[in-house]
Amino acid sequence: MMELYIGSHLSTAGGWNALLERSHEEGGTAFAFFPRSPYGKRSKALDPAGAAAFGARLKAEGYGPLVVHAPYVYNLAGKDEAKRAFAIEALAEDIELLTAIRAAGQEVYINIHPGAHVGQGAETGCRLISEGLNQVFERADGVMVLLETMAGKGTECGRNFDELATIMDGVENKANVGVTFDTCHVLDAGYDLENDYDGVMRQLDEAIGLARVKAIHVNDSQFGLGSHKDRHANIGEGQLGIPFFTRLVNDPTMAKLPMILETKEQTPTTHRDEIALLRGLVD
């Protein structure tokens, strides 16, 4: 039976050790966190001097890759040059912080929402994202950036596999960029994971390559196929349902990846319970 690397998105309050204790409490073997505030301010809780020891402790405890989530405020596809420049600089700083964790032997990725073109058109937006990532990697390149599959809300770029492939093709150092597969977003974008799992995986492989998918955001969907809503539901309580998640955790290609829950904490034990539920679905 395959052991899942799984956990949720955790608060950084209290610093590195408190972060790990929260993971222990939910029974996790992977997790996500924001490296700075949602508005982009650097975190006072995450002292860079403690990053290497944190990474060494995770490695010693057998954790799967961390999937750190960049703040939503970053928009590499935006019109505002000052905001775009901030996103490039801040993402490079995030990579520098996380490089110490990776140097200690613990794999870590940083996940980003690719960006929104805000009326400039998807082609322009995708080009700007590629160019922005190239600038980021000129400053710092010790950690892989994962582009998240998006639901297609508003002017989001990355609303389908082909757009993500276009962005990745524009990145000069291909080894620096991969993909996070968000189950809710992929369904909401119009890919029928519920009824055509194999077909969706073939499309993903043809457009991007399954080997470039490095992490999974494990979320059910409130509104479902083609809704473009991006509204997460708790596991088994949405349009995907338990049969889909059973298929996912028994797919040898996908089940080896770190799985991050981004579902609503309805009770203090929601994520602990969902982690146990998903592990219980493994054959």
Swiss-Prot record:
One of its GO terms (molecular function) is zinc ion binding. Zn(2+) 1 binds at residues 69, 113, 148. It is an enzyme of class 3 (hydrolase). Its cofactor is Zn(2+). Binds 3 Zn(2+) ions. Zn(2+) 2 binds at residues 148, 182, 217, 262. InterPro entries: AP_endonuc_2, AP_endonuc_F2_Zn_BS, Xyl_isomerase-like_sf, Xyl_isomerase-like_TIM-brl. Its EC number is 3.1.21.2. The keyword Metal-binding applies. It catalyses: Endonucleolytic cleavage to 5'-phosphooligonucleotide end-products. The keyword Nucleotidyltransferase does not apply. Pfam families: AP_endonuc_2 (PF01261). GO terms for biological process: base-excision repair. SMART domains: AP2Ec (SM00518). Keywords: DNA damage, DNA repair, Endonuclease, Hydrolase, Metal-binding, Nuclease, Zinc. Zn(2+) 3 binds at residues 185, 230, 232. Endonuclease IV plays a role in DNA repair. It cleaves phosphodiester bonds at apurinic or apyrimidinic (AP) sites, generating a 3'-hydroxyl group and a 5'-terminal sugar phosphate. PANTHER family: APURINIC-APYRIMIDINIC ENDONUCLEASE (PTHR21445:SF0), ENDONUCLEASE IV ENDODEOXYRIBONUCLEASE IV (PTHR21445). HAMAP family: Nfo. Belongs to the AP endonuclease 2 family. This is Probable endonuclease 4. It comes from Bifidobacterium longum (strain NCC 2705). The lineage of its organism: Bacteria, Bacillati, Actinomycetota, Actinomycetes, Bifidobacteriales. The gene is nfo.
